[in-house]
């Protein structure tokens, strides 16, 4: 829980006091404070914290301590109120459950032994408190409280309360050595007046002796104005200026205590009446702030011893718990270190996995790019293959046409080859016949001058060899017969030659019935008639017409 900020107040020395604090405490179970003091109690007129009850809100907060002066609770002033009014203020604050505790207090530094007890004028116990504690001086700030010291007090009480015994005074002593009271803010040069006269004197006229300040003591004006604030008097700016004008301050800012009391009596008479403090009570109120503590009763000392022992036992238990918690903390620290190392290892592994994932993603992107490139190459290859297939189809069509042409040409050439072979055979036979005829004619012509008997024998031989019947039958007209024979031979040879002489690309063939027909391999056509038969018939007719007149004229000659 954080400290609350001070509420808006009029500018005063209280606001400038470093010991003045305003805190905010969360309201949960209860305030948990035991108080003492008030204007109707001997430890007053201010209200102090006697004890912080364990389990309460202030105990959980931990900022309030026994001995702190309460200034206000939830902006209700605790200055100039009685003990009962202070309790009613706390009760009213408890009923306001919706708001947290807003507590203004002044931290006191000087305690008498036990933290729950501050210097008190009497061992009287208040209604809600334990042994009553004394109030601090109103003439100095809480952080600079002045306590008188005695050198003649014997230490007869328990060592638990050394500071309280150090300031106790006993009625049996007639004289007590006192140290002068000076403001801590003053320099050593300002203590000369205090050395001349003691700061306060004892008044042992009763069981509770009073200690009054020397009027010649010089104190800070701000401290004296703060004492007025403790009394519940809030001087205005004009009153503060008038007070400083009437009280003469030296170069150090200190004023005489007696002069300040007289001026305060004249200026703040009405305000003292409002807070139920008479003018005659101001010195007693101011003087009652430096009362030493009386000795505590034996039962209270025993009670405090028991509380101390219980506190020591609780401290030992807390120490053991602290050691256990320290061991547990060390174990937790070791576990934390192990967890940190594991976390570092996991983080490194995570970074390695992330790097591997990045590399895998990069490789995947590269593979995807290569796959896209392969697909593009495949598409290009498929397009090229389709183009090549189209070209191949065109080329195959052209090849088919060229093959068909070649086949036609081969067929025609084969036909021509066969025809040439047949013509060769026909020419060979015709040539042999012609050669035989010529040889026979030559022998006949050579032997024409031989005797007739020899000639007749040779004719018979030639006729048998050359098959010339006409020449053998008609011996009388030998030249005419020879001419006729030669014509017949020429006709027969021509018939042999012309019969097998077909035009280019023509070939004769036979059907299954043995009928001859002619095939034109160039035009892929067939014909039943010989392609040159008509031309051959015409030529034969012309020759016969020419030979007939000649045969008719030869016998006449």
From Swiss-Prot:
A single MF term (Gene Ontology): syntaxin binding
Biased composition (Polar residues): 179-194
Keyword S-adenosyl-L-methionine: no
The organism's place on the tree of life at top rank: Eukaryota
Residue segments, region Disordered: 142-214
Residue ranges of every copy of the WW domain listed in the record: 500-533
Pfam family, one: WW
SMART domains (UniProt xref): PDZ, WW
PROSITE patterns in the record: PDZ, WW_DOMAIN_1, WW_DOMAIN_2
Cellular compartments per GO CC: phagocytic vesicle
Matching InterPro entries: PDZ (IPR001478), PDZ_scaffold (IPR051342), PDZ_sf (IPR036034), WW_dom (IPR001202), WW_dom_sf (IPR036020)
Transmembrane segments: none
Domain PDZ: 19-105
Subcellular location: Cytoplasm
Stretches of the chain forming a coiled coil according to its record: 298-408
Free-text tissue specificity from the UniProt record: Detected in skeletal muscle, heart, testis, adipocytes and pancreatic islet cells.
Location, primary (coarse class): cytoplasm
Any single GO BP term: positive regulation of cell cycle G1/S phase transition
Keyword field: Coiled coil, Cytoplasm, Phosphoprotein, Repeat
PTM entry text: Phosphorylated on Ser-99 by PKB/AKT2 after insulin treatment. Phosphorylation on Ser-99 abolishes the interaction with STX4A.
Biased composition (Low complexity): 142-154
Phosphoserine: modified positions: 10, 12, 99, 216, 467
Function: Plays a role in the translocation of transport vesicles from the cytoplasm to the plasma membrane. Inhibits the translocation of SLC2A4 from intracellular vesicles to the plasma membrane by STX4A binding and preventing the interaction between STX4A and VAMP2. Stimulation with insulin disrupts the interaction with STX4A, leading to increased levels of SLC2A4 at the plasma membrane. May also play a role in the regulation of insulin release by pancreatic beta cells after stimulation by glucose.
Subunit structure: Interacts with STX4A.
Protein's recorded name: Syntaxin-binding protein 4
């Amino acid at each position: 829980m954080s400290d609350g900020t001070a509420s808006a107040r009029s500018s005063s020395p209280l606001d400038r006091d470093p010991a003045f604090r305003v805190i905010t405490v969360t309201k949960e179970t209860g305030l948990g404070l035991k108080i003492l003091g008030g204007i109707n109690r001997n430890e007053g007129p201010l209200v102090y914290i006697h004890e912080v009850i364990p389990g309460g809100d202030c105990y959980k907060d931990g900022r309030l301590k026994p001995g702190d002066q309460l200034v206000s609770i939830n902006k209700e002033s605790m200055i100039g109120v009685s003990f009962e009014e202070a309790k009613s203020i706390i009760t009213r604050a408890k009923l306001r459950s919706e708001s947290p505790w807003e507590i203004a207090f002044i931290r006191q530094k000087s305690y008498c032994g036990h933290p729950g007890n501050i210097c008190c004028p009497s061992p009287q116990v208040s209604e809600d408190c334990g042994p009553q504690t004394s109030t601090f001086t109103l003439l100095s700030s809480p952080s600079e409280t002045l306590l008188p010291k005695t050198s003649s007090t014997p230490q007869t009480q328990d060592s638990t309360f050394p500071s309280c015994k150090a300031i106790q005074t006993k009625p049996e002593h007639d004289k007590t050595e006192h140290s002068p009271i000076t403001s801590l803010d003053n320099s050593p040069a300002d203590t000369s007046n205090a050395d001349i006269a003691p700061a306060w004197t004892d008044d042992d006229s009763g069981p509770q002796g009073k200690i009054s300040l020397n009027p010649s003591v010089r104190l800070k004006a701000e401290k004296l104005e703060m004492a007025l604030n403790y009394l519940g008097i809030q001087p205005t700016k004009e009153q503060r200026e008038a007070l400083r004008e009437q009280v003469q301050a030296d170069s150090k800012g200190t004023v005489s205590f007696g002069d300040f009391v007289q001026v305060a009596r004249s200026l703040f008479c009405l305000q003292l009446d409002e807070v139920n403090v008479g003018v005659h009570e101001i010195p007693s109120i101011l003087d009652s702030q430096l009362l030493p503590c009386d000795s505590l009763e034996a039962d209270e000392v025993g009670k405090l011893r028991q509380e101390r022992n219980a506190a020591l036992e609780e401290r030992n238990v807390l120490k053991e718990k602290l050691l256990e918690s320290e061991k547990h903390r060390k174990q937790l620290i070791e576990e934390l270190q192990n967890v940190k190392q594991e976390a570092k290892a996991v983080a490194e592994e995570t970074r390695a996995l992330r790097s591997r994932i990045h590399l895998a993603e990069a490789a995947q992107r590269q593979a995807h790019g290569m796959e896209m490139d392969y697909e593009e190459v495949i598409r290009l290859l498929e397009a090229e293959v389709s183009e090549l297939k189209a070209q191949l189809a065109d080329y195959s069509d052209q090849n088919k046409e060229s093959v068909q042409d070649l086949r036609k040409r081969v067929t025609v050439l084969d036909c021509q080859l066969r025809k040439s072979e047949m013509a060769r055979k026909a020419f060979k036979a015709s040539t042999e016949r012609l050669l035989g005829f010529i040889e026979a004619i030559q022998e006949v012509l050579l032997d024409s001058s031989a005797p007739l008997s020899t000639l007749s024998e040779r004719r018979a031989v030639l006729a048998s060899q050359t098959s010339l019947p006409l020449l053998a039958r008609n011996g009388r007209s030998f030249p005419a017969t020879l001419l006729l024979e030669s014509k017949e031979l020429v006709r027969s040879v021509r018939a042999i030659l012309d019969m097998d002489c077909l035009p280019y690309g023509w070939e004769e063939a036979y059907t299954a019935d043995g009928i001859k027909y002619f095939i034109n391999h160039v035009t892929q056509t067939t014909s039943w008639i010989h392609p040159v038969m008509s031309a051959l018939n015409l030529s034969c007719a012309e020759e016969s017409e020419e030979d007939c007149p000649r045969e008719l004229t030869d016998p006449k000659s």
